Amino acid sequence: MPQTLGFRELGQMAYEPVWQAMQRFTNERGTDAPDEVWLVQHPPVFTQGQAGKAEHLLLPGDIPVVQVDRGGQVTYHGPGQLVAYLLLDVRRLGFGVRDLVNRMEHCLIELLASYGVPAAAKPDAPGVYVNGAKIASLGLRIRHGCSFHGLALNVDMDLQPFRRINPCGYAGLAMTQLSDHAGPIEFAEVSARLRAQLVKHLDYAEQTTLTGGID
């Protein structure tokens, strides 16, 4: 099994080109292809998962809605939210889907604890919560034993668009963000801590930064 996990720092990019690129990456990867994690912020967009229902889109307004191929219901992405797309050969890693979700949740819980923010997962509602308010969302797709999509952590963003939807299909679900609990946040530092936690919880020995585009 590879010992180094590669990360691509994409900055801010529109949702659909990144989604299309991760589909291509997953469809074309061979059995020896190294795993990658793509870190990105998106301009405002609602994404509707495969289980999504139209009634959970309350008032999208001027924010585009994209129907996507991950699990779960509707969520919102916007600037100030750290999104990590996990392009992993989970069969090679020996992870089941529930195991991978648990690892992602523990990764986020430990990251938040490093800022002094106690968080927890819920057995019936994937994601990570602080005092009952959701701070991170998870959504995955597994194809040919490989994962894509991933997690979204609210760092320091405008949470108002979440009021235009029932987040993850839950009416009235409160949303929160790291900056509300830990004060001023350096986004790059959150990204660095997330990288370290992913390496740890995905059982890698080290990490590297990958260069080049995703086209």
UniProtKB/Swiss-Prot annotation:
Subcellular location: Cytoplasm
Record's catalysed reaction(s): octanoyl-[ACP] + L-lysyl-[protein] = N(6)-octanoyl-L-lysyl-[protein] + holo-[ACP] + H(+)
Catalytic-site annotation from UniProt: C168
GO-annotated biological processes: protein modification process
EC number per UniProt: 2.3.1.181
Pathway as given in its UniProt record: Protein modification; protein lipoylation via endogenous pathway; protein N(6)-(lipoyl)lysine from octanoyl-[acyl-carrier-protein]: step 1/2
Keyword list, A-Z: Acyltransferase, Cytoplasm, Transferase
Entry binding sites for substrate: R70, G71, G72, Q73, V74, T75, Y76, H77, S137, L138, G139, G150, L151, A152
Domain of life: Bacteria
Family (UniProt): Belongs to the LipB family.
HAMAP family in the cross-refs: LipB
Protein name stated in the entry: Octanoyltransferase
UniProt organism field: Pseudomonas fluorescens (strain ATCC BAA-477 / NRRL B-23932 / Pf-5)
Encoding gene, per UniProt annotation: lipB
